[in-house]
From Swiss-Prot:
Keyword Hydrolase: yes
Organism whose genome encodes this protein: Chenopodium album
Catalytic activity: a chlorophyll + H2O = a chlorophyllide + phytol + H(+)
Any GO BP annotation: chlorophyll catabolic process
Name of this chain's protein: Chlorophyllase type 1
Similarity field: Belongs to the AB hydrolase superfamily. Lipase family.
């Protein structure tokens, strides 16, 4: 899966499996 960076609630959430960066 490609890493999708989503700007949500002032935090950067990267959807990769179940990995997320805050």
């Amino acid at each position: 899966s490609e890493k999708i960076t989503v700007f949500q609630k002032g935090n950067f959430q990267v959807t990769e499996x179940s990995s997320h960066f805050v």
